[in-house]
Design a protein with these regions (language model features):
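Metallocofactor- and cofactor-centric catalytic cores in central/energy metabolism, strongly enriched
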Residues: 39-67
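Short beta-strand-centered segment that lines the nucleotide-binding/catalytic pocket of NTP-utilizing
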Residues: 171-182
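N-terminal accessory targeting/assembly segments
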Residues: 1-22, 26
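Ser/Thr/Gly-rich flexible loops in soluble cytosolic domains mediating phosphotransfer, phosphorylation
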Residues: 81-122, 226-231, 238
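Structural motif
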Residues: 11-14, 65-70, 252
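Internal active-site segments that recognize and position negatively charged phosphoryl groups
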Residues: 124-170
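Small-molecule kinase domains that catalyze NTP-dependent phosphoryl transfer to phosphate-bearing small molecules
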Residues: 130-137, 210, 217-258
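Conserved phosphate-donor/acceptor-positioning beta-strand/loop module used by diverse small-molecule
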Residues: 191-208
Length: 274
């Protein structure tokens, strides 16, 4: 099948992250398509539309927008119709449903989700927490954590912690090291959600060898040894089972998928305590 080329114009009155993520999720369902993105952010006045319309003339394709101002949206929709450019407002279905269910009109505030409000500062605090509680640091401060991620080396603990932090969760993580007992005493007296991450030993060996090559580390031969890793995985699973912690196999999972699985377990855990 021949590869198709599609110009896609992503238009937003804020950072463009919302419309970009929607486009990314949808386009992932189509193969053999070469996507050329044209990003138009902070579009908030009629003057900003001139460059956009010129861009549509140069590279016609489709347009996805996240624009709150009704006048700007109307102008974009009218121009797109005249140019034969399909246009979709990605927020409309959800906003319309919420308007009906809640019985109130939207605020028409561009970039409303990025206001410097309490939730924003809570997310930033969560990021700071994840950084200062990475790889076993400050384990004595776990009483302030929402959750603890435990796993052997190279099971995506840090990136998963940071991803969840950007969702507002205070996450600590601990790396299991061969022949070093897990410091169980830090959990004494705490009602804390803990999840274990594991990986396929062969996959882990590949990842660790790649890391060693990148770091030019030839001293630790056991680090990527398949037998050593198999023992690490087995011992980690024993620890997880003995504590009754849920276990997630991150083999071939993206960080986003791992985080989603963690949140499923966390939600069920939290519901039993509400």
């Amino acid at each position: 099948m021949a590869v198709q080329t599609l110009h896609i114009h992503l238009v937003s009155d804020s950072t463009g992250e919302t419309v970009h993520q929607v486009a990314r999720a949808c386009l992932a369902q189509f193969a053999d398509v070469k996507i050329i993105e044209h990003v138009w952010t902070l579009v908030r006045t009629p003057a900003h539309l001139e460059a956009l319309f010129e861009g549509l003339d140069r590279n016609p394709g489709i347009l996805l927008m996240s624009i709150i101002d009704q006048n700007l949206r109307s102008s974009i929709e009218k121009t797109c119709r005249s140019k034969g450019v399909p246009a979709v407002s990605v927020l409309d279905p959800v906003v319309n449903m919420l308007t009906t269910v809640l019985g109130q009109a939207m605020t028409n505030l561009p970039g409303g989700q990025r206001r410097l409000d309490t939730a924003y500062f809570a997310r930033m605090a969560a990021v700071d927490f994840a950084v200062s509680h990475d790889d076993g640091m400050n384990m004595s401060n776990l009483k302030k954590a929402d959750m603890l991620i435990v796993g052997i080396s190279r099971t995506s603990k840090t990136p998963t912690s940071m991803y969840l932090a950007h969702r507002g969760y205070k996450v600590a993580n601990y790396a299991l090291v061969p022949k070093v007992p897990f410091p169980q005493h830090y959990l004494d007296g705490l009602d804390l959600f803990v999840v274990g991450l594991t990986n396929d030993p062969k996959r882990l060996s590949q990842i660790r060898r790649t890391r060693q090559a990148a770091m030019q580390d030839n001293a630790n031969e056991d680090y990527a040894d398949i037998d050593q890793i198999t023992d690490e995985v087995r011992n980690a699973r024993r620890l997880f089972a003995s504590n009754g912690w849920p276990v997630i196999d991150v083999t071939r999972r993206s960080v986003e998928e791992t985080a989603a699985a963690i949140l499923q377990y966390y939600t069920k855990w939290a519901e039993t305590r509400s």
